[in-house]
């Protein structure tokens, strides 16, 4: 950027140009929302807004909300209340609420927080800049909630958070009917992107230096049953084929995916995981409960034996795979015997870690109407027992890693104590978090680089590697991070809206 020399009058036209309005996106909930927030940021930047710096009050605050848990409502409306005095003092400030809670509450958002300017649903991400302009011009709050998907969010511009790792959405929505989950009613039925579109986005990211991608969907192993493009044939084996295709992309070093459903987890996916070198040896597969009776009540169309059988086959094919899960404690009607069944499955499964939740009653879900709602004190006591069991298992599994050589993708923001301990942090191929001593190479190692080191210690939630790096490889991702560059995608990838793609243009002679 050119700097103004001392004593030289600035160009008057530049002084007359108003400073760009700034924005901040606050994200709650799952990885889908994190990825959607990258799209929201990309849209706002494309529209001329600038991301607000740390500690700076933004002109526009966007909430990308979650509706899965009860405290999501409390968190949103509490934060909106905190912004009310700012809005009153500065009417030009704008507040937008999107995501699953906006889709669910709709006009209720304005009744509860009338100072909000824009409410937009899960299918209206692309409308945000227009809605902000309209609200500012008309001085009237704008509400836009579409009932079905009109275009894939992945066709929108994205402002990625990381130079070295990226989300890639392969589907939107869900066809399952879990009784505790409100997501299908808010995000709609599953719609799958064409494999070529997914791979084009992956290639675009790799071309910009990204080393790791995570394929994202509510139920990734149902991929292929409901393509948006009606000319794309239904293919139950599409997800395994997609994994193998990712393995053929030069420069893509790590592939992860989340989340599969146990009822649709097939052996072709296990084979693809084992035979595709850049697919990471890790699996996150929600269990929810170890009780067959509770699984039936949840409408989870598998049973504990099937779940454990999948894990056994994964570990046979990939011996060092780290397996993680989601668990719900206190589902309506859960008895002590049901809860003990969950503890038994957790003990047998030997998860490396687990996301554990106390059941939260959500209006609009079948489970909210079930008899046998469990007292909070009972749920809390069971939750604590489950946490203690999983902490013990996680620590035992992590201690088993001591002495093992690990390859780390160096990360930023993963180690809260890195500055105090003179360590850096990275993720092993199996997803474990490792805090490592950089040794004499410290000044040369950047986030996005690859380091090989040996595990010397363990805690329940991380590993320690204080032996110093045995290898360090500088990468294009590390270069990009050092230069402050993050990849941009979503424009020019040939990604269609919903429906068949436009016909290809007629070419003369040879065309590549």
UniProtKB/Swiss-Prot annotation:
[4Fe-4S] cluster 2 binds at residues 174, 178, 181. Its EC number is 2.8.4.3. SUPFAM superfamilies: Radical SAM enzymes (SSF102114). Residues 470-486 have a biased composition (Basic and acidic residues). GO terms for molecular function: 4 iron, 4 sulfur cluster binding; metal ion binding; N6-isopentenyladenosine methylthiotransferase activity. It catalyses: N(6)-dimethylallyladenosine(37) in tRNA + (sulfur carrier)-SH + AH2 + 2 S-adenosyl-L-methionine = 2-methylsulfanyl-N(6)-dimethylallyladenosine(37) in tRNA + (sulfur carrier)-H + 5'-deoxyadenosine + L-methionine + A + S-adenosyl-L-homocysteine + 2 H(+). It is an enzyme of class 2 (transferase). Binds 2 [4Fe-4S] clusters. One cluster is coordinated with 3 cysteines and an exchangeable S-adenosyl-L-methionine. Residues 1-20, 470-512 are annotated as: Disordered. [4Fe-4S] cluster 1 binds at residues 30, 66, 100. Keywords: 4Fe-4S, Cytoplasm, Iron, Iron-sulfur, Metal-binding, S-adenosyl-L-methionine, Transferase, tRNA processing. It holds the Pfam family UPF0004. Residues 399-469 form the TRAM domain. Belongs to the methylthiotransferase family. MiaB subfamily. Monomer. NCBIfam families: miaB-methiolase (TIGR01574), MiaB/RimO family radical SAM methylthiotransferase (TIGR00089). This is tRNA-2-methylthio-N(6)-dimethylallyladenosine synthase. It comes from Mycolicibacterium gilvum (strain PYR-GCK) (Mycobacterium gilvum (strain PYR-GCK)). The gene is miaB.
């Amino acid at each position: 950027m050119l700097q103004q020399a001392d004593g030289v009058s600035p160009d008057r036209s530049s002084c007359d140009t108003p400073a760009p309005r700034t924005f901040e996106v606050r994200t709650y909930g799952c990885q889908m929302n994190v990825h959607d927030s990258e799209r929201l940021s990309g849209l706002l930047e494309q529209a001329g807004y600038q991301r607000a710096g740390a500690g700076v009050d933004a002109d526009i605050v966007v909430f990308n909300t979650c509706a899965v848990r009860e405290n999501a409502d409390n968190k949103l409306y509490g934060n909106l209340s905190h912004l009310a005095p700012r809005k009153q003092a500065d009417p030009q400030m704008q507040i937008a609420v999107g995501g699953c809670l906006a889709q669910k509450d709709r006009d209720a958002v304005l009744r509860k927080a009338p100072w909000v300017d824009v409410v937009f649903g899960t299918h209206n991400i692309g409308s945000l800049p227009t809605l902000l302009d309209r609200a500012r011009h008309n001085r009237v709050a704008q509400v836009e909630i579409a009932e079905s998907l009109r275009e894939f969010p992945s066709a929108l511009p994205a402002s990625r958070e990381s130079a070295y790792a990226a989300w890639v959405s392969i589907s939107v929505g869900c066809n399952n009917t879990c009784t505790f989950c409100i997501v299908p009613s808010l995000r709609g039925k599953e719609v799958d992107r064409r494999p070529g579109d997914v791979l084009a986005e992956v290639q675009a990211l790799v071309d910009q230096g990204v080393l790791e991608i995570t394929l994202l969907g509510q139920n990734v192993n149902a991929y292929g049953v409901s393509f948006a493009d009606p000319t794309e044939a239904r293919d139950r084996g599409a997800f395994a084929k997609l994994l193998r295709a990712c393995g053929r992309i030069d420069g893509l070093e790590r592939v992860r995916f989340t989340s599969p459903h146990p009822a649709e987890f097939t052996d072709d996916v296990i084979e693809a995981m084992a035979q595709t070198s850049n697919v990471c040896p890790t699996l996150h597969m929600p269990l929810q409960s170890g009780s067959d009776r509770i699984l039936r009540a949840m409408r989870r169309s598998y049973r504990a034996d099937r779940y454990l059988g999948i894990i056994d086959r994964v570990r046979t094919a990939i011996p060092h795979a780290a397996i993680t899960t989601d668990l719900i404690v206190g589902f309506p009607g859960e008895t002590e015997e049901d809860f003990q069944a969950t503890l038994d499955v957790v003990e047998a499964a030997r998860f490396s870690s687990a996301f554990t939740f106390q059941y939260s009653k959500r209006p609009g879900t079948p489970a909210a109407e079930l008899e046998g709602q469990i007292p909070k004190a009972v749920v809390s006591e069971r939750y604590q027992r489950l946490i203690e069991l999983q902490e013990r298992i996680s620590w035992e599994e992590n201690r088993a890693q001591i002495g093992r050589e690990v390859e780390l993708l160096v990360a930023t923001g993963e180690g809260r104590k890195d500055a105090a301990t003179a360590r850096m942090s990275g993720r092993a191929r199996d997803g474990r978090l490792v805090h490592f001593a950089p040794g004499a190479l410290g000044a040369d190692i950047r986030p996005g680089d690859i380091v090989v080191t040996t595990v010397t210690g363990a805690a329940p939630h991380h590993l320690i590697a204080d032996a110093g790096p045995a290898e360090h490889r500088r990468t294009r991702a590390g270069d990009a991070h050092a230069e402050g560059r993050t990849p941009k995608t979503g424009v020019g990838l040939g990604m269609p809206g919903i429906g068949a793609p436009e016909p290809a243009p007629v070419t003369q002679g040879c065309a590549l």
